Swiss-Prot record:
Metabolic or biological pathway, per its Swiss-Prot or TrEMBL entry: Amino-acid degradation; L-histidine degradation into L-glutamate; L-glutamate from N-formimidoyl-L-glutamate (hydrolase route): step 1/1
Cofactor binding mode and count: Binds 2 manganese ions per subunit.
Protein name: Formimidoylglutamase
Species of the source: Enterobacter sp. (strain 638)
The protein's Enzyme Commission number: 3.5.3.8
Gene: hutG
PROSITE patterns, sorted: ARGINASE_1 (PS01053), ARGINASE_2 (PS51409)
Alphabetically ordered keywords of this record: Histidine metabolism, Hydrolase, Manganese, Metal-binding
Binding site for Mn(2+) 2: 153, 155, 240, 242
Pfam families linked: Arginase (PF00491)
Length: 312
């Protein structure tokens, strides 16, 4: 498969505690690695999308292309509990030069193949351009189902641009659905009115996007989520790490001045994971160039750890 590489074996390393007990295991010891892109009929396919071309096109801070393996390393040494032995590392899709669209197509095909084989997909971006590819792959895999997109994000990412960027994925997914006379079901939780122009707010209204603003997150998120999940056959969850406060997550292209603390996000993530409807999830916009002593990587990896643990 072009634009794809297996994950180097030295990425998955950590402390070995098996001398204490046979079940004293960590992620690096229970995760399976695939040397070839051959989807299984079950499990969680962990994939990377090493891209910041979309961030570059959107005039953001580049560096997210390095994120997938940094996040793998941060996850590797965490304890392995229920659900983590389902993880299968299916490698990373890469962008050659500025050929973002080709890489997005490759990731989309890979996601579709995994989903149709019986796997669910967990993708480490990369910028939020990851979502156009990941979301399209899920929609292609389930053409007759109501796939609801839930975005935990300070930004709507409904920009109108000549080329795909990290700011356009949900407009692209809306256009994809419209071309197929398919309902576009999109909810954005944690969105910042200060971080989105009136034009973007108007576009969200035109597309009937469900919104929970950052200021009202604690009050409204869980009740709104109940209504969103009731409309879904399957859910694609995309977590833009810039939804977190800059103090918790400095390592993103656009750090949040306000943001939603991780302890407030986690009940929402848990409810989605335990709904039985979660089909796909990703974490995007992590930029290791701006991390502080690995703080952001560890938090992002912990969020991924929780998703895999809670995923029903």
């Amino acid at each position: 498969m072009t634009l794809w590489r297996p994950t180097p074996s030295d990425i998955w390393q950590g402390r070995d505690d098996r001398a204490e007990a046979s079940n004293a295991l960590r992620i690096f010891q229970t995760l399976r690695q695939s040397e070839h892109f051959i989807p299984a009929n079950s499990g969680i396919a962990l994939m990377g999308f090493a891209s910041d071309e979309g961030v570059k096109r959107n005039h953001g801070r580049t560096g997210a292309a390095q994120a997938p393996d940094v996040l793998r390393k941060a996850l590797a040494n965490m304890a392995s509990h229920h659900g983590h032995d389902r993880l299968v590392d299916m490698g990373t899709f890469t962008v050659e030069a500025d050929q973002l669209e080709a890489a997005q197509h490759a990731l989309s095909d890979g996601v579709q193949a995994c989903q149709q084989a019986g796997m669910r997909t967990l993708v480490f971006g990369g910028g939020h351009e990851t979502a156009w590819a990941h979301g399209r792959g899920v929609l292609e895999a389930f053409p007759d189902d109501r796939v609801v997109i839930i975005n935990l994000d300070a930004h709507l990412d409904l920009r109108n641009a000549e080329r795909a960027t990290s700011g356009t994925p949900f407009r692209q997914l809306a256009q994809y659905c419209a071309a197929r006379q398919r309902e576009f079901q999109y909810a954005c939780f944690g969105v910042s009115r200060a971080g989105n122009t009136q034009a973007l707010w108007d576009e969200a209204g035109r597309l009937n996007v469900t919104l929970v603003e950052d200021l009202h997150f604690r009050r409204d998120a869980l009740s709104t989520l109940d209504a969103v999940l009731a409309q879904a056959d399957r859910v694609y969850l995309t977590l833009d790490l810039d939804v977190l406060p800059a103090g918790e997550m400095p390592a993103v292209s656009a750090p949040a001045a306000l943001g939603i603390p991780a302890l407030d996000l986690l009940p929402v993530i848990e409810q989605i994971c335990r709904s039985g409807k979660l089909q796909a999830a990703d974490l995007v916009e992590f930029n290791p160039l701006y991390d502080r002593e690995g703080q952001g990587a560890r938090l992002a990896a912990r969020l991924a750890w929780q998703i895999a643990h809670w995923w029903a």
